[in-house]
């Protein structure tokens, strides 16, 4: 049975059989009072000063806990999970330590934290202890139209049209990458040469089968496909830039930098083509521009990183590499030492061999790297007994060197992967909100008939419940405990789509 009571503003007003919250003017006497809390039939007893350490919580605020006071039994009654209250009470006794009991599920314990109003700090402690991903909130634009556009292009899971735009973006990225790879096939290069015949000028580099045509570029099918892809990339980038809530933060985002890198090579190539059309130019200058174009075209391959915007797998890989930078640095350092040692050793071991494939120590660097990574192309091999011994030691040292930091990197990957997958499954538990039961008028009538309260006491209880209802609703409108969350912020951990 739960009976609510009112807001006691006068210290002289009290309840029969309930000395706990009588607002005695002597603070020492008040702090030593005991409070009995009944959790679904299991009674707990603690001191009032223990609960008053956290006055903003449900049990620490006399006004809030009055709603659950039973004057007949002189105790507070809560029809809640009993095992969870051990940790809740210890939270007050320890001054803020919170640890979930092993026999209490995550969703139930998170709901109890919200019910007893322990606060966001306690919830954050619980999330960190349980390995939850820290919820990162990013502001949304204030303008409603910009907000809808931003959600449409930035968060694919926000709506159905946003998913469609994400699918279009991924398709365009794949088309661009496929086109970039196919245009280097000899069959397409031969077709381009036959198509333009002698009307085109071709330039080649020594020891290279790649030739570049310097005329009729704008009629090339691959150039047309590239232009269409760039139109979409540019449109997407401009829309996201115009709709973003902060222009400064927009350009510091790594994904936006990748978008810029994916677009710029096209316009540089286009400007170079137009410049060569308007000048006679010398062959040396054209060869230099071709060398620049080759580097710029290579940058186009980085468009594949645009897929990480829509892929959780790539994001997990990036987090793993970022967390494993120390181990990767040690791996590179160990390989560097091994390459120097074994390339020097194999050079001197093969120095007396007439047909030695190691004319110098720098030439042996490649062999040492290939051997330590256990690839073994076979393009450079030792022929003497000493050289073969050095090669064997090099391979063994490479296996040991690589094997040492790899488990740490794999462990980091497993951590981020399981944290992401478990975070998705458990995210719904963190969003569960539980509103305390507010006694209704029938409850008051029932308690009135079953108790020995006087009419004046009953009227005070009823008036207090009315004030309590108003305070509770007003607070929850501010904190969004029982309503929708702040619509001007979005949790980015829930706005990812797995491709």
Curated annotation (Swiss-Prot):
Assigned GO CC terms: axon terminus; dendrite; juxtaparanode region of axon; membrane; plasma membrane; voltage-gated potassium channel complex
Transmembrane segments: 161-182, 222-243, 255-275, 290-310, 326-347, 389-417
Keyword Lipoprotein attached: yes
Extracellular compartment spans: 183-221, 276-289, 348-361, 382-388
Residue ranges within the lipid bilayer that do not cross it: 362-373, 374-381
Glycosylation sites: 207
Cytoplasmic topological domain: 1-160, 244-254, 311-325, 418-499
SMART domains (UniProt xref): BTB
Span list, region Tetramerization domain: 1-125
Chain positions of motif PDZ-binding: 497-499
Record region (S4-S5 linker): 312-325
Tissue: Detected in tadpole brain and spinal cord.
Lipidation residue positions, type S-palmitoyl cysteine: 244
Keyword Ubl conjugation attributed: no
Site (Important for normal, slow channel gating): 252
Chief localization: membrane
InterPro entries associated with the record: BTB/POZ_dom, Ion_trans_dom, K_chnl_volt-dep_Kv, K_chnl_volt-dep_Kv1, K_chnl_volt-dep_Kv1.2, SKP1/BTB/POZ_sf, T1-type_BTB, VG_K_chnl
Catalytic activity: K(+)(in) = K(+)(out)
Region feature Disordered, mapped onto this chain: 1-27
GO annotation, biological process: action potential; neuronal action potential; potassium ion transmembrane transport; protein homooligomerization
Subcellular location: Cell membrane
Top-level taxon of the source organism: Eukaryota
Site (Important for binding with the scorpion mesomartoxin): 381
Gene3D superfamilies named among the record's database cross-references: 1.10.287.70, Potassium Channel Kv1.1, Chain A, Voltage-gated potassium channels. Chain C
Subunit structure comment from the entry: Homotetramer and heterotetramer with other family members.
Protein name: Potassium voltage-gated channel subfamily A member 2
Species for this entry: Xenopus laevis
Gene responsible for this protein: kcna2
